[in-house]
Amino acid sequence: MPKTANVSVRTKITSASTVSKETIRYREMIPQIEKRDGRLVPFDFDKIATAIWKAMVASEEGDREDAELVAHQVVGELGRFAKKYKNFLPTVEGIQDSVEKYLILNDYVKTAKGYILYRDKRAQLRASHADVPDHVKKLAEESRKYFDGNALGEFVYLRSYARWIPEERRRETWIETVDRYMNFMRENLGDKLTEKEYTEVRTGILRQEVMPSMRLMQFSGDAARRCNTCGYNCTFTAPVKPEDFAEIMYLSMQGCGVGFAVESQNVEQLPQIMKQNGKKLPTHVVDDSKEGWCDALTLGLKTWYSGKDIAFDFSKIRPAGARLKVMGGKASGPEPLRSLLAFARERVLSRQGRRLRTIDAHDIICKIGECVVSGGVRRTAMISLSDLDDVEMRDAKKGQFYMTDPHRSVANNSAVYETQPTNAELMDEWVALMKSGCGERGIFNRGSLAVTMPKRRVEYFKKAGFLGDDGVVRGSIGANPCGEIILQSKQFCNLSEVIARANDTEASLLEKARLAAILGTYQSTLTKFGYISKDWLDHCVAERLLGVSITGQWDSPVARQPEIMRKVRDTAIKTNIAYAKRFGIKQAMSVTAVKPSGTVSQTFNCASGIHPRHAPYYIRRVRISATDSLFKMMRDQGVPYYPEVGQSLEGANTYVLEFPVKAPDHSKEARFKDDLSAIEQLEYWKRVKLNFTEHNPSTTISVDEDEWIGVVDWVQKNWDIIGGLSFLPRSSHVYRLAPYEAITKEEYEERLARFPKVDYSKLIAYERQDESDMKRELACASGTCEVV
């Protein structure tokens, strides 16, 4: 146990006027540290020890020797990093983080708490006296105009999309984000667009009328220049060889959502696993890169498949918490990869002399998703397609799977149908779906694709061998995680969208459709894929798919009219034909879809895709870390916040911010989440399917307890047009600090009057290093994914 301080709290701390032996010794490894303002100063061990000693005196815990012991532990960790990583440069904030860590590890709880509170107060003091540069103020003021009355949107934008500018030690503003996207667009297209067209596209994005791929919005610049995969939203693949698992990992690490098939038709193509022969390959040193992690997985799988074994050396992998400079986020350290390799080894060796089962392939891929979430990507999105008669996959989330197989939570599961099921077959699946409580498995109807796809794509599928003589699509054709884009195995979905507003007219929607199609057509030219196999390039070039979506449909009465939907669809198709010719590429085989738009809807204040808003007036709550500089700035400017449920106001590690929101459409035609029955939701989905999408409208149907039988009857009657559908039990459960809470008009107006006018330019005074989390956005986020 820690010692109790044996001196008065008022003891005067003195420091030596000369440099100590410890400082001289440690400077051989760590000559300098970086201050908050970017200045480099000589490393000083005594300053660290003295700071810890002052904290111990204040909390009456420990003595000078204890303080020096903790300081040696802190600096010892820095020394290990300095040996492992060339040009390692500690920062003041990083050193203070280590001090907190080792105070806690040594059980100096009171000292650690006092030290954390002291740091927070000092940060507030620095922020209150910090000057925001005039040009930053001006940029922030100009950008704020585009978020007029949308404090939630500006917050989500800064949190999810604003990149760090190292030279100015701050996050970019909305105008700078749009210009970074436009600069990358010019870099790739050159004079294939006129200045007038570039201006039209830029203005449409700035005014939040249309959006490109939000992945490309995040990563335009160095990251997308290095590998275009990070600019795409989602993918689909049906693994048939060990390398395919590594490609899934690579794409997930790039931030792409991954749809995958574990049907018998592809899993049975994986090789037979040889029995272990006792041979062990030399230890493999894992390179500290996405490619290095993926190579390690491929090597492990191939080795275990061949009856041999191998060990891995993780010493090159950067420590947990290190910044990921190109993609953003923080490194996880080696533990997630170590866990994945151990899991994959166990699964492969358990099947010696046989092949992997479909559930084994599913679990390994889910474990990849879990590894990637831990390894720097904020969230991953996956969908697993399986055979209708695969009982193990049907029951994959039965009971308390989150206790025994928690990795399975990262993927939604859907059953594949190639013909219309009998009543008995569908009811078996339906009962399992109802009992699961999580709406699984969903439906992926491969058998309807030949009827619902555009003729040009049906012809392409015939030539590619996907369409049988009976007119049914077969083979590895699937979908992205939210089911709005129909994909071949090893193909990307390419999204852009129209944001429909309450005041839109037919003319304004058609102009937005034109701009969104230009964006999608441009994005389809980005095929520098790097690590993954050439099949991905071949499939993308052959089809040049677009996914022009309409979000905010329940904000805009005009956008919900069938004849307007058809005109918007036709405008997008015609625009794609014209600009594909100009860009020297093929026309897209399919153009229109509806994506859920979870994060986009929060950022740009619109209803999510095909779904209505929560209520006419509601509170939107957002979780955020207590250590996040963005939270501290919001708190200090008076934004309402509460500790997470079960945590105290003083000791919380997560806080909940509250934003009042008003829906724009309060006409008689307006509908909200609880206004639509399951059948009404399905009928509206059908309207969009038949009048707008060449792919599929993504939706999750909320079903009341007494609606399940009526819903399954509707599904049977409309089987020929169903592509992909998901269902969830409608929940009326109310719990504290829920993401959404309906309120009255009076409460909304009262909350709005009290809500501060947040000056986001002040973030520069709080954020001394890159804290942006660029891997948060998943364009296919829907349902529970909207809980940000």
List where the protein language model places each region:
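Extended catalytic cores of very large enzyme megasubunits
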Residues: 1-788
